[in-house]
C-alpha cells in the first residue's frame, strides 16, 4: 500500500532479487507523464510537432488549427481548437493552447499556455494561464 515509484522501488527490487526483466528501445517520442505539468508539456509537444499525431482540425493560419470559425477572437500559435467549440466575442487564446471538442469560452476570456479538456466551460472574463480545465461531473443525488 502507498506510493510506488518504478525507478526507485520496483527496478531496484527486481535487480536485488535477481529477477529477470527486459527493456525495449524505441526511436519514438516518450514522456512518462506523472503529473499535470508533464501532461500539459506532452500535449504541447504534440501541438508543436514533436509527436506524429493527427491534428483533427485544419490549419487556418500558421500554427493554428481550428475546427470552428475564429471570428471575433484573437489566436496566437501554436493552438488547436476542436469541433463544436463556442468562443465568445473578444476571447484571446495565446499558445500553446488546446481547446478540446465542445468547450465553451465566455466573452473576453483569456487562455494562455493552457488546455481545456473536452466539454470544459470557461466563464466570461476568466484568465486561465498555465492550467488544465475540465468539465465537472454531473452530481448524483442519493
Regions picked out by a protein language model, each given a short descriptive name:
Residues 15, 20, 27, 75, ...:
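A generic, residue-level signal for flexible/boundary positions that often mark functional hotspots
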Residues 57-73, 79, 85-91, 97, ...:
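A structural motif detector for beta-strand N-caps
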Residues 26-27, 44-45, 84, 90, ...:
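Histidine- and/or cysteine-centered catalytic micro-motif in compact active-site loops
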Residues 138-142:
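Extended, intrinsically disordered, low-complexity segments
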Residues 1-54:
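Catalytic-core segments of class I nucleotidyltransferases/pyrophosphorylases
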Residues 31-34, 77, 95:
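Alpha-helix N-cap/loop-to-helix boundary motif
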Amino acid at each position: 500500500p502507498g506510493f510506488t515509484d518504478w525507478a526507485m522501488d520496483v527496478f531496484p527490487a527486481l535487480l536485488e532479487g535477481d529477477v529477470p526483466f527486459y527493456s525495449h528501445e524505441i526511436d519514438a517520442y516518450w514522456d512518462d507523464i506523472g503529473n499535470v505539468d508533464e501532461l500539459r508539456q506532452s500535449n504541447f509537444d504534440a501541438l508543436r510537432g514533436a509527436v506524429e499525431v493527427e491534428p483533427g482540425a485544419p490549419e487556418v493560419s500558421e500554427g493554428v488549427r481550428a475546427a470552428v470559425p475564429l471570428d471575433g477572437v484573437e489566436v496566437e500559435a501554436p493552438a488547436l481548437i476542436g469541433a463544436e467549440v463556442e468562443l465568445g466575442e473578444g476571447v484571446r487564446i495565446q499558445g500553446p493552447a488546446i481547446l478540446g471538442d465542445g468547450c465553451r469560452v465566455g466573452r473576453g476570456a483569456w487562455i494562455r499556455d493552457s488546455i481545456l479538456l473536452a466539454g470544459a466551460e470557461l466563464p466570461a472574463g476568466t484568465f486561465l494561464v498555465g492550467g488544465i480545465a475540465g468539465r465537472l461531473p454531473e452530481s448524483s443525488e442519493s
